[in-house]
Amino acid sequence: MKISTLAVVSAFAVTAIAGPVRPDGIGSDKYLIELGPGETQWVTKDQKHHMRAAGKTFIDITDEFGSGFTTTEVVPANYPKSARHASLIKPLIANLSKENLMRDLTTLTKFNNRYYESDTGVESATWILQQVQKIIKDSGVKGAKVEKFTNQFKQFNIIATIPGSSKSTVIVGAHQDSINSKSPMKGRAPGADDNGSGTVVILEAFRNILKSKAIQAANATNTLEFHWYAGEEGGLLGSNNIFKKYKADGRQVKAMLNQDLTGFTNNGKPEQLGLIADNTNQQLNEFCKMIVKQYASIPIVEAKCGYACSDHASAHRNGFPASFVAETSYRNTNPYLHTDGDVIANLNFNHMLEHAKVVLGFMGELAMAPNL
């Protein structure tokens, strides 16, 4: 275990507490981050931003200091080896709309930024919440709901639920926040790719899965959740809060798919999807490969992105099987991330449709999977 700033870090907590505890000599301006299993460091908020700008990934675990957090055995799951519900899912895929993606992303990128501690970060989250509320109302699906999951910072998480007949839960998530690494609070951060693209992809998938006859008839075996996370750019803050809570509550999360960066295609080079192979669940990754082969039109290749590179890591460290399908084989190919240049003009909406196909395939197949 690597310890810095003269602090002895002995344990972590399951759930966030009202006021983070800090050891003697560590001021309120310091945050505890985890850069790898057992590798922790106390840093300032500015240092966190500089580390993210330099490509260093981590989880902010300040709220876990001194409270006995332990890793958990992975929740067991039994994934289908082949697609069994193409007749239900392919009509939904055919109804996916590139125009919806463009419209929603245009609105989302008009906020000055979606930084998790800024007023516009709250305004953008409120806009997403309102879209989800409208989608549910228009669908007429009984039992479908959306709620806020609040954090200790301004921006809130959003959780939409489609109930199934079992307690087993399948999740797709995307972080909603954006950041300008040079000026986090006030700087322009349209965040079109990072991660407006993932935000609107799962919004469009949610819009269409509610049109499923099986969902409308309440025939889903497993509960589905769509998550929009706050504060990813601060160290996976919102997603870690959720999955710590789910762990403490004994939730049976059988699968989590992360959608972060879904629109950049590396200047016209052959398109592919990137399946992140590190800090993910191998069995679920194999299921993702099958889903891509069955429902997408481009190939998938394995890649690595390091510890805590995105919100799937929050599920993974809390014992829930997680996968991450990104836009390319190498996560950082988009040179505009965390700048005012991360704009819609750099994105490929056809590529984003491929991600939406994968999300619908993933959620549709697992919604109906028996004995998951």
From Swiss-Prot:
Pfam families: Peptidase_M28 (PF04389). Its EC number is 3.4.11.-. It is found in: Secreted. Glycans are attached at N95, N195, N219. One of its GO terms (biological process) is proteolysis. Zn(2+) 1 binds at H175, D194, D260. Binds 2 Zn(2+) ions per subunit. GO terms for cellular component: extracellular region. Keywords: Aminopeptidase, Disulfide bond, Glycoprotein, Hydrolase, Metal-binding, Protease, Secreted, Signal, Virulence, Zinc. One of its GO terms (molecular function) is metalloexopeptidase activity. InterPro entries: M28_fam (IPR045175), Peptidase_M28 (IPR007484). Monomer. Probable extracellular aminopeptidase which contributes to pathogenicity. This is Probable leucine aminopeptidase MCYG_03459.
